[in-house]
């Protein structure tokens, strides 16, 4: 979205675009944090924060090894699944969860799915981003949408592994150091549950 405005911004001041590459998310995130550390003379702080984050992620990946997951985004009553090659692919690539479906089409808005799909795939963990809660005042929309007899048959539901992620963090603030620390903490709590 900001890409269209970069030239106009350059007329005002120097521009450094910290966009993350969804196909190579974590390395691009590291590059951005390192570059920002250099720009603000905080290279050591950036290095320390990245090192601590890497340790936390390694622990999550160790705990998540062999566990299947499906990350879905709930928008009003619609559900979209995100796979390994998506904007949320780092859940699988970096945090160690095994994608429940390797055939999910990679797209910005995910692949439209229904309750039956979730039951059919039956992941160990159902990771949920509530877009509606992130951009409106409708709290707990995803919980209401997923509170049904079909979802209650899933392994994730029965094992208490439906994880409602920090919607604003995952949908709006996704990509910064603080947001990545929150993501690591959320996923760490989820796998230890």
Tell where the protein language model's regions lie, with residue ranges.
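Short, flexible loop segments at the rims of nucleotide/cofactor-binding pockets, characterized by
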Residues: 48-50, 102-107, 140-141
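Structured C-terminal subdomain patch of bacterial secreted/periplasmic proteins
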Residues: 124-193
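Short helices/loops that flank or line small-molecule/ion binding pockets
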Residues: 113-122
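Proline-aspartate-enriched helix->loop->beta-strand connector
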Residues: 1, 14, 122-126
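Alpha-helical, coiled-coil/dimerization segments enriched in small aliphatic residues
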Residues: 83-111
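Structural motif corresponding to alpha-helix initiation and N-cap regions
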Residues: 3, 111-112, 148
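Short, well-ordered beta-to-alpha junction loops that form the rim of enzyme active sites
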Residues: 1, 72-76, 131
């Amino acid at each position: 979205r900001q890409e269209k405005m970069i030239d106009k911004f350059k007329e005002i001041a120097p521009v450094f675009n910290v966009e993350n590459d969804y196909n190579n998310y974590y390395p691009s995130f590291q590059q951005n944090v390192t570059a920002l550390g250099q720009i603000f003379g905080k290279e050591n702080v950036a290095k320390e924060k990245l090192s601590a984050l890497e340790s936390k992620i390694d622990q999550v990946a160790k705990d998540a090894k062999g566990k299947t997951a499906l990350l879905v985004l709930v928008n009003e009553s619609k559900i979209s699944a995100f796979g390994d090659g998506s904007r949320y692919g780092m859940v699988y690539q970096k945090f160690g969860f095994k994608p429940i479906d390797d055939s999910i089409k990679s797209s910005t808005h995910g692949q439209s799915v229904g309750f039956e799909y979730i039951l059919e795939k039956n992941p160990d963990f159902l990771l949920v981003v509530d877009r509606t809660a992130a951009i409106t005042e409708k709290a707990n929309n995803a919980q209401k949408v997923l509170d049904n007899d079909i979802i209650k048959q899933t392994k994730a539901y029965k094992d208490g592994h439906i994880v409602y992620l920090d919607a604003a963090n995952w949908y709006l603030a996704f990509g910064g150091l603080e947001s990545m620390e929150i993501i690591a903490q959320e996923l760490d709590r989820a796998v230890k549950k």
